[in-house]
């Protein structure tokens, strides 16, 4: 039986055997995999995402972040057939249904990658035109949107384990925020494989994309005002 792993702190973690939860094929009820997040230091994982992943993303321009997303899309798409089969087993869907999820994930990542290219080589997104704030143009201001210094925590639903992770991660990464994604345990087999293909392709900096398979435990206790 496959043991599903979390990916945090630049490493894979299989959890503690005594706390495993079983995943079953919804059609046959056969066990597919076991999962646990017990033993993971979530405080350290969050700090690592902020300091390593966040710093790496903020150093990149919008266009460069877009290139990361396109690379993620291609990495996942290369395993499309495998992921479709996995989706049918893990989610109990038809092949046609599974295509919505897998192709939705790669299509969304690619689209946000293209948006990054359109935004160009800057690091700040201007918010409207500038305004003269005094009698002369010497006192002038303009709002700009910059990356937050925290991490984006995504708790996802069971029905789109690939697309759900991808559409949230794409927006956050383009905005310069590292991601820790937590798929629904019942269908996290698909998400784990998606993340695994990205890690194997080595297409994003360490700390940018994290995965929790299993319980979030005390994760929320370690968040602060810059996290979302």
Language-model segment annotations:
Residues 1-134:
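N-terminal Rossmann-like NAD(P)+-binding subdomain of aldehyde/semialdehyde dehydrogenases
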Residues 120-228:
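Rossmann-like NAD(P) dinucleotide-binding subdomain of oxidoreductase/dehydrogenase enzymes
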């Amino acid at each position: 039986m496959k043991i599903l792993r979390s990916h945090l702190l630049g490493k894979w973690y299989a959890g503690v055997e005594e706390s495993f939860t079983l995943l079953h094929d919804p059609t046959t009820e056969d066990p597919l995999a076991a999962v646990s997040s017990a033993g993971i230091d979530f405080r350290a994982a969050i700090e690592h995402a902020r300091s390593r992943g966040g710093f790496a993303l903020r150093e990149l321009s919008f266009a460069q972040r877009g290139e990361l997303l396109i690379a993620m899309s291609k990495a996942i798409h290369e395993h499309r057939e495998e992921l479709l089969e996995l989706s049918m087993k893990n989610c109990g869907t038809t092949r046609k249904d599974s295509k919505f999820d897998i192709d939705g994930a790669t299509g969304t990542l690619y689209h946000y990658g293209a948006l990054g290219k359109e935004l160009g080589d800057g690091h700040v997104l201007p918010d409207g035109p500038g305004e003269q704030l005094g009698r002369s143009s010497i006192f002038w201001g303009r709002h700009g949107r910059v990356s937050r210094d925290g991490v984006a925590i995504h708790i996802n639903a069971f029905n789109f384990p690939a697309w759900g992770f991808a559409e949230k991660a794409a927006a956050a990464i383009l905005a310069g925020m590292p991601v820790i994604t937590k798929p629904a345990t019942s269908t996290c087999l698909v998400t784990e494989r998606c993340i695994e293909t990205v890690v194997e392709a080595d297409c994003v900096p360490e700390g940018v994309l994290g995965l929790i398979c299993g319980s979030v435990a005390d994760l929320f206790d370690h968040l602060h005002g810059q996290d979302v």
